[in-house]
Amino acid sequence: MTLHAYLGRAGTGKSTKMLTEIKQKMKADPLGDPIILIAPTQSTFQLEQAFVNDPELNGSLRTEVLHFERLSHRIFQEVGSYSEQKLSKAATEMMIYNIVQEQQKYLKLYQSQAKYYGFSEKLTEQIQDFKKYAVTPEHLEHFIADKNMQTRTKNKLEDIALIYREFEQRIQNEFITGEDSLQYFIDCMPKSEWLKRADIYIDGFHNFSTIEYLIIKGLIKYAKSVTIILTTDGNHDQFSLFRKPSEVLRHIEEIANELNISIERQYFNQLYRFNNQDLKHLEQEFDVLQINRVACQGHINILESATMREEINEIARRIIVDIRDKQLRYQDIAILYRDESYAYLFDSILPLYNIPYNIDTKRSMTHHPVMEMIRSLIEVIQSNWQVNPMLRLLKTDVLTASYLKSAYLVDLLENFVLERGIYGKRWLDDELFNVEHFSKMGRKAHKLTEDERNTFEQVVKLKKDVIDKILHFEKQMSQAETVKDFATAFYESMEYFELPNQLMTERDELDLNGNHEKAEEIDQIWNGLIQILDDLVLVFGDEPMSMERFLEVFDIGLEQLEFVMIPQTLDQVSIGTMDLAKVDNKQHVYLVGMNDGTMPQPVTASSLITDEEKKYFEQQANVELSPTSDILQMDEAFVCYVAMTRAKGDVTFSYSLMGSSGDDKEISPFLNQIQSLFNQLEITNIPQYHEVNPLSLMQHAKQTKITLFEALRAWLDDEIVADSWLDAYQVIRDSDHLNQGLDYLMSALTFDNETVKLGETLSKDLYGKEINASVSRFEGYQQCPFKHYASHGLKLNERTKYELQNFDLGDIFHSVLKYISERINGDFKQLDLKKIRQLTNEALEEILPKVQFNLLNSSAYYRYLSRRIGAIVETTLSALKYQGTYSKFMPKHFETSFRRKPRTNDELIAQTLTTTQGIPINIRGQIDRIDTYTKNDTSFVNIIDYKSSEGSATLDLTKVYYGMQMQMMTYMDIVLQNKQRLGLTDIVKPGGLLYFHVHEPRIKFKSWSDIDEDKLEQDLIKKFKLSGLVNADQTVIDALDIRLEPKFTSDIVPVGLNKDGSLSKRGSQVADEATIYKFIQHNKENFIETASNIMDGHTEVAPLKYKQKLPCAFCSYQSVCHVDGMIDSKRYRTVDETINPIEAIQNININDEFGGE
């Protein structure tokens, strides 16, 4: 029973001395007493290599490299193990989650958090922490009973103690945790003869838990000798750089005093690891107060990058230089990081440079398609077949892998499902998924082609296959009663899915193609899944459980699964975190992410028990718990020290100025401290360095081509570019080995997001030999030619969703008002409140079920919206009644369609126009309402257009002039052309072109006293006042509002009179008859010009900016045109907005059938 301590700073030869000592013993007596080297799990492989790769050793049976848990198993092999079943991490958390749910009603502080998955994970960590530091439920209960404390803290500890106690009772005599097995190991030590003959070496640790100190105490007591290696100068100052390992030394001294033995200390002061003065000076001076600056010889570098991605690209380039120019091997290089965001960057960047690497971290399995399939399957059952988990399940492609183009079929199915609002048991309705229904996908139904029919039949078949599997799974699970039944049902369902065979086939294909890591992932996925099922049966067995609880517990288990990947080769870059990675004696170590906030890292308490509660508990209960945040914060300098002293040749520190989320970052204060130790240690700004040394960017062929592309693009933009890039281009271009993909990059250089003008033949192929279009299509072209090209040329359509769009609401109002108008023959004056309500209900019952597959009856929200629609209609009818009472114009025609060849007698004829290319223009559409008034054998007509949006319920004559608003003039033109079909007199003249805003008015009051019922009704009526343009003819004016008189402004039409009876400029929107005719004729010319441009093949991305607004704000095609408001302002078209449109139109000479100038 002897105890040795090798003490010294980093690189002083402590571990080398230990290895030399062990090797000498192995050479002297290969079959001698056992030698045990205890090291952290991350270091065991590296230390085993140190023995295996030694040519002087021919192998030995006496030396083993173990961590504490493996050592316990070695002892159990000799003296016998425990009889209880060992609980895995997943099994432990599943059991604790179930206990929490059962005990939820007894919890005082955590009752509301009990249902959350994360809470059981935190609670498991806390219980494991208690076990590591030998804190039992009895400790907690005794402490709570004897001490006065804050109510919150008391309730918290009582809750934890309750779960802890229940957990201990559940596992008693049946299960054992990893921490408990170590306690059992301590109890078995006296029985081990093998241990009594062993020489024990402990290396690579900087701190221990209470249970580990007890193990060390047992080893010291029962082993022949124990040697512990610590990185410390022996200073016990709590503010020393070596506080953490010195704390370990203090504990070892206490153990030695308890066992009444002395520690044979051996101090190591001579530095051996470092090959140069830079690293020696860095190690010796890092923690001194009085700095001794020396000249830097170039073995320490500090790199500053703009972004994290740029930072890792530069590290990759420098690794290539290390391999090519310095003759290093990949295994001589290590990268250490702390910010988890870097792990993703390593995976995405290093393969681009063909750098082999191994990240020493475990990755969660939760994002693997198989795990996502299983978790989505569980959620489908839990959520009663909601659409989101169903679509996630389908998109994993695990259950649909047997289908060709399965991803495309699933996309089509998703479109259909979202359009029809499929959820719940509607998935099972075969009639809903009839192939014929797919012809109605989108806004327009069409007849299916044979290819479309075959495709949609595959979609339906795929859906049926997946539904069959889900139903099988649901049936199997619903028949289960115990956990064992559920686990069996789950496994049998996976067999029914043929998942094992599918995974094994995929694994074999990956292995055959050399993708061994992905193949290993599949093995671990399946084995992990089986392990969770085994754990469930082990822990719960025949215990009854609801399906809901089982699926919750099962999901908890799946969350714990992690990939443990074995390195695929020995010669690879080692990557790990600064806190855990065990890399020693590397020629070059890169420390990335050296930013303030990462190194040092602000440490906050993450456990259920706060730092203050820990300190109070330790003081009052005389126990030790895991270190508090302030203690961990003090050790940050030691973490940096250990990380930077792993190298023996070069150390490169790097940091970025921008984080992964775009936040600004500062340099680590440790780098400022390191920089102060040396003269001439400057920070290298990477962009500036490459600007001065462009050849430094040319380290890897593929990446050089990408950087070359950026350089040539800058050159084309007249920026100054180094001649070396032009030389590089010529070399790559002329090399058959290097020029692969160069043509693609060069074509990208000239890409400027410009559309191409279509040829005459292609225009006719896209648009036809005649244009049959609505007014809105031409208005869309005026907004942006590309928008028209995308919608009517390429026929791009947005996915239709099962939700009410703005245009759906407009269609509803139009249909309802048409229905009611026809029922009363347009005589709104006859309506009373009872009749309004009756007609509204009738109309809604008739029309709403036809909207979006009965969307408005699909949920409580939409049923509420239906009632709101009814209220708006009732208010609208009241306003129409009021307007009809005071107008001589009578509504006569409703929702009147027009086209070149009418299909019925009720439809109107639209005159065909012709483009400059001779292409016919056939305009079609529908006029919401036509009001007429006849006097002296002359008919006057009003065009009334219902708008549900306030923004579109305004007639802007400037827009009319420039062809941006063509609807009203077109409608008036059509009506004037069809006097006979409308039953009008031989003489027909325009009355008004008016918009009616269908809405629910909001009236503002300053106070309750302002509310007056009569005034309220008047204000409501004013909100429905028609807007637009009125013929200034006195007959029209008198007929629009019979109340008009001097000093009166109408509240139903945009007309008002001055004191002298003349039209008020402020209250009137009027134009003379000739002007209206000119607008109509000019509108026709806009049609011809627009249609001619369309057939000319114009497809420019050229939105029209009007009143500082762009149509891009509401355009569906921005993801196609990629127009950017910040850099594409040169693309915008504008018009002269300062013109007076009436004066401008009057100055145009137009000859037409109306007898204009």
From Swiss-Prot:
Needed cofactors:
Mg(2+); [4Fe-4S] cluster
| Enzyme Commission number(s) from the entry | 3.1.-.-
Single GO term (MF):
5'-3' exonuclease activity
The cross-references to InterPro entries, in alphabetical order and at most eight, read: ADDB_N, DNA_helicase_suAddB, DNA_helicase_UvrD-like_C, P-loop_NTPase, PDDEXK-like_dom_sf, PDDEXK_AddAB-type
Q: Where does [4Fe-4S] cluster bind?
A: C784, C1112, C1115, C1121
Top-level division of the source organism's lineage: Bacteria
Tell me the PROSITE patterns matching this sequence.
UVRD_HELICASE_ATP_BIND (PS51198), UVRD_HELICASE_CTER (PS51217)
Domain UvrD-like helicase ATP-binding, chain residue ranges per copy: 1-275
Keywords assigned: 4Fe-4S, ATP-binding, DNA damage, DNA repair, DNA-binding, Exonuclease, Helicase, Hydrolase, Iron, Iron-sulfur, Metal-binding, Nuclease, Nucleotide-binding
The note describing how and how many cofactors are bound reads:
Binds 1 [4Fe-4S] cluster.
Q: Which residues bind ATP?
A: G8, R9, A10, G11, T12, G13, K14, S15
BP GO annotations: double-strand break repair via homologous recombination
Residue ranges occupied by any UvrD-like helicase C-terminal domain in the UniProt entry: 269-583
Q: Does the keyword Nucleotide-binding apply?
A: yes
* NCBIfam families found in the cross-reference section: addB_Gpos
Please name the HAMAP family in this protein's record: AddB_type1
Family (UniProt)? Belongs to the helicase family. AddB/RexB type 1 subfamily.
Q: How is the quaternary structure described?
A: Heterodimer of AddA and AddB.
- What does the UniProt record say this protein does? The heterodimer acts as both an ATP-dependent DNA helicase and an ATP-dependent, dual-direction single-stranded exonuclease. Recognizes the chi site generating a DNA molecule suitable for the initiation of homologous recombination. The AddB subunit has 5' -> 3' nuclease activity but not helicase activity.
Further information: Despite having conserved helicase domains, this subunit does not have helicase activity.
Name listed for the protein in its UniProt record: ATP-dependent helicase/deoxyribonuclease subunit B
Q: Which organism is it from?
A: Staphylococcus aureus (strain JH9)
Q: Which gene encodes it?
A: addB
